Amino acid sequence: MVKVKFLGHAAFYIEGSKKILIDPFLTGNPQAVAKPEDFKDVDLILVTHAHGDHIGDAGEIAKISGAKIVAMYDIANYIAEKFKGVETVGMNYGPTEVDGVFIVQVPAWHSSSDGKYSIGNASGFIVKLDGKTIYHAGDTYVFKDMELFSELYGPIDVALLPIGGHFTMGVKEAAKAVELLKPRTVVPMHYNTWPPISADPEEFKKLVGDKAKVVVLKPGEELEL
C-alpha cells in the first residue's frame, strides 16, 4: 500500500517501501501541519523548483534524515553548496532510478529562482513506487504534452495538480489537464494558501466531472492507493 499525505500548499509525503517528500515547504507555510523534525527517517526529497514555497525545508530535512535530494541539476548544486554534506541527485528532465524508486522529471511551465537569481528550470515529477504511479505537477500552466505523461508512464494512479491560478493553472486549466493526463484520481493543491491563489476545489470537482475521481485533502489528510 502507498499512502499520499497532503502537508499543505504543494507539499506531500509519500509512504510505501520508501518514504518520499515532495516540495517540503513547512516552515512559514500557513497551512503546514508538520515540522521538519517530523521527517527524520525520510529516504528521498524531490524538489520541483527553487522558489521558497517549494524548495522549503528540503536542505534542513536532508541534514537531519540523510535523505537524498532529487532536483534539477542547477538546483541540486545550489542546495549542495548551501547545505554541506547533503547528498543530491541532479537531473535535467528524463527518467532515472534512485534507491529503487523510478523517477521521471518532466517539464513544467513556470520560473525557478531563489527570489534574486534564476536557478535551473521548473519541473514536475512522475514517481513509480510499489506498483503505483504518482504525478506531482509542481507549479505549471496546462500544456498539450501532458498527454505524453500517461502515454509513456501511465496509467497515473493519482495526479497532484495546482488549481490556484495567478502563478499556475486555475480550476478551468487544471480540469483540462485532467483530460490530458487521464489519472484515476486527482488531488488539488497550491490554492488558498494566500489570497492571490484563492480557489474553490468544489468548482474544480464539478469541472472534472466523471473524468477522474477528485479527492480534496485537508492538510494532514492522506489518500491510500
From Swiss-Prot:
Q: Any idea which GO molecular function terms this record carries?
A: hydrolase activity
Keyword check for Hydrolase, yes or no.
Answer: yes
- Top-rank taxon of the source lineage equals Archaea
Gene3D superfamilies the record matches? Ribonuclease Z/Hydroxyacylglutathione hydrolase-like
Write one Pfam family the protein is assigned to: Lactamase_B_3
Keyword Methyltransferase listed? The answer is no
Q: Which UniProt keywords apply?
A: Hydrolase
Q: Which InterPro entries match?
A: Metallo-B-lactamas, RibonucZ/Hydroxyglut_hydro, UPF0173, UPF0173_UPF0282_UlaG_hydrolase
What the record says about family reads:
Belongs to the UPF0173 family.
Q: Which named protein is this?
A: UPF0173 metal-dependent hydrolase PYRAB05000
